[in-house]
Amino acid sequence: MEFQVRDARLTDIERITALIERTDTRWDSAELNQVADLLRQLVYLPNAAVLVAVENKPVVGVAVLALRPSVAANGLIGALDLIAVEPGSGADEIAGALLREVVRSARNKGCRELEVALADDPAEHAQWQKLGFKAAGQRLIYSLARTPVTTR
């Protein structure tokens, strides 16, 4: 399998959202439109990186790196916000290449750590640990999403 990992371009956004739709069923069409809008912004932001793996023209993988400052870490923290790979042969190779590029990009941007949110699947934890990630406790999240106000 011959593919290339590179920074995403605006012209890739439609193919990226199509890949996300095929690989992760939790997104509905309205959410995918919001994802596309956000990706269009992230392509240009210095505190993010949107990377794609392309095989000829099709996008076969995507990874999103987001940066945030951290006083506790005394620097920037990189977060692997999203990784999606076309299922099938070569998926592990594509995911590995995307992850290596995310690590390189995070280092180049001055990150002290790279974090990834884990699912509850112990097998997934083991896969990340094989790649060099270490368990670092749990996080609590408070949603700041706005909810629509209903009128009576």
Regions found by a protein language model. Give the residues of each.
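Conserved beta-strand in the GNAT
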Residues: 52, 58-67, 79
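Conserved acetyl-CoA-binding loop-helix of GNAT-fold acetyltransferases
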Residues: 85, 91-104, 130
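Conserved GNAT acetyl-CoA-binding A-motif
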Residues: 106-118
